[in-house]
Amino acid sequence: MNNFSIISEYKPAGDQPKAIDEIIAGLNSKKRSQMLLGITGSGKTFTMANIIERTNRPTLIMAHNKTLAAQIYSEMKSIFPKNAVEYFVSYYDYYQPEAYIARTDTFIEKDSSINEQIDLMRHSATRSLLERRDVIVVSSVSCIYGLGSPDLYYQMTVNLEPGKSYPRDKLLNDLINLQYERNDIGFERGCFRVKGDNIDIFPSHYSDKAWRLSFFGNELEYIHEFDPLTGEKLAKLDKAMVFGNSHFVMPQETVNSAISGIEEELQKRLEFLKSQDKPLETQRLNQRTQYDLEMLTETGSCKGVENYSRFFTGRNAGEPPPTLFEYLPEDALLFVDESHVSVPQIRAMYNGDRARKEVLVEHGFRLPSALDNRPLKFEEWEKFRPQTVFVSATPGPFELEETGDTVVELIIRPTGLLDPECIIKPATNQVEDLIGEIQATIAKGFRVLVTTLTKKMAEDLTAYLQELKYKTSYLHSNIHTLERIEILRDLRQGTIDILVGINLLREGLDIPECGLVAILDADKEGFLRSEVSLIQTIGRAARNSEGRVILYADKMTKSIDKAMSETSRRRQIQQEYNEKHGIIPKTINRAIHALAELEKVDSKLDKKQAHTLFDNPAKLKAHIEKLKKDMLKAASNLEFEQAAKLRDQLKTLEEAALELS
């Protein structure tokens, strides 16, 4: 059995050893829920990693959005390079669910765009959970949505071992049943091809490796792992397991049984609609469902097949759907990161999904069984979750109630950094005062974060600061992940001095160069100026030894008072620790991800180099192909900065190739 093994130059320090021991003691005493209160910069991720290593249990880490999940995944992958660290989030780049607006008699068809790279990583995650124990899966809250049955998924695998006999036609048919596509011309993920005595399979969980099965008659002689781009053999395998190209693969008998169940429900529903004198809904439901049944009979699938998932999984009406939680072993461990946001998200998901689908069922677009294609209810999630550690700097009421207000604190930072000094200034003329503070902060070589209440105010402030010749950018929800990372990189490098946003705390900004956080209209009570939001925003300045926070307010609200009191308490604890151990706080000098490599490519220089180094067009083409492969690999590892750098290089080299041709 593989054990977890941390590879790091750091050892637990500050509050970390005590917190690790307390959490592990709680796990050993069978506590179902624990609360880890970890402030910004206290090393929450490293603490979680040490708990995982000490307990040696498969682990699921839930985060409230893809970006935070990606950050945790990247950190865990660097801490556990020898173990399986996986990423499981929604694979939709774009998703428009089907819906019906009765008021205007408008039906909106489902429309979506699937990210192939994330789909690959989802397959890799479920495969790892079924094959090994040293697994950490970092997931967004979308892991509570329905997934294919783990029993069927595992049952449908094709096990391959050299020396054994596999009738050729049966093996090819098995691959097709796993929803692999035969393609002897284009070879890509989820495909197989046949060449003489060889069968090449491109597994659903790989982007840069494929398997070559070499036969003598029906006997499998060798399994080679090879590079699908170059054909280079990478390794000889003793065995291989081919998992489905979809989490919803199923044997034909299951499909036949499901079709019978759908037909039976359809007849009952049609009779009900007729009794309600709804001829339009009756005709609509019959037409749509009969078409789906024909597709299922002929191809084994149909558009919107997930709406019939209850019949494929053998669940009864109202029972919870299979989710990622059913892929976890019984002794798994769960961390819920930023639980004050994640837990309310889990609560809200079921009701929103249910309301939309009830309208579809009522108006004859879907059978009632479509209601069972859903996320878990909160109480179902409560039932399924294993031993859980909630992690947050600002715990919510549910976590505190679950843990009996017993909180394991992670307040002392090993770096000695204090919580920032907080100052209240009048909101009247706040922008004019802010300009002066910005000048003083930039003069010290630091950066500034400004948070406003509305998008309009953020846009206007950004435009005003740019007019005054300040290097300013605006961060908002419409910016894609890669562009967001580029903006943060520019901020850290000094290309940008000021970043304006509405809800910066949600962006997970950790900028050691940040010397000032300015909170405009801090006295306007509400979600953006609640105690939790203020504490989280104040934490953005906690990675700089000279970090300050200015709250612009004309009155002292309860939220401001509580946030400042909590910040002061944490600051006092850290000061006492520093004095006792003779620690002088120092700003964290975190690398800007290999600055030299991430600088934007100078196109003229690259073109010149391309002509000099790649005067042979064939070599240049081969180098471009390699860069494409490296870019995709970087993207699959969520190394977006590296992927962006390679993308820029590709663009200039392709221009050079065009000139050379």
From Swiss-Prot:
Keywords in alphabetical order: ATP-binding, Cytoplasm, DNA damage, DNA excision, DNA repair, Excision nuclease, Nucleotide-binding, SOS response
The keyword Cell membrane appears for this protein: no
Location of the Helicase C-terminal domain: 430-592
Short motif (Beta-hairpin): ranges: 91-114
Sequence ranges assigned to domain UVR in this UniProt record: 621-656
Main location: cytoplasm
Signal peptide start and end residues: none
Keyword Cell inner membrane appears in the UniProt entry: no
GO BP, one annotated term: nucleotide-excision repair
Domain of life: Bacteria
The Helicase ATP-binding domain, residue ranges: 25-414
Classification via InterPro entries: Helicase/UvrB_N (IPR006935), Helicase_ATP-bd (IPR014001), Helicase_C-like (IPR001650), P-loop_NTPase (IPR027417), UVR_dom (IPR001943), UVR_dom_sf (IPR036876), UvrB (IPR004807), UvrB_inter (IPR041471)
Subcellular location: Cytoplasm
Residues holding ATP: G38, I39, T40, G41, S42, G43, K44, T45
A GO term for molecular function: ATP binding
One annotated Gene Ontology cellular component of this protein: cytoplasm
UniProt-listed Gene3D superfamilies: P-loop containing nucleotide triphosphate hydrolases, UVR domain
Family, as annotated: Belongs to the UvrB family.
Subunit structure of this chain's protein: Forms a heterotetramer with UvrA during the search for lesions. Interacts with UvrC in an incision complex.
Record comment regarding domains: The beta-hairpin motif is involved in DNA binding.
Role summary: The UvrABC repair system catalyzes the recognition and processing of DNA lesions. A damage recognition complex composed of 2 UvrA and 2 UvrB subunits scans DNA for abnormalities. Upon binding of the UvrA(2)B(2) complex to a putative damaged site, the DNA wraps around one UvrB monomer. DNA wrap is dependent on ATP binding by UvrB and probably causes local melting of the DNA helix, facilitating insertion of UvrB beta-hairpin between the DNA strands. Then UvrB probes one DNA strand for the presence of a lesion.
Name under which the protein is recorded: UvrABC system protein B
Organism: Rickettsia felis (strain ATCC VR-1525 / URRWXCal2)
Gene: uvrB
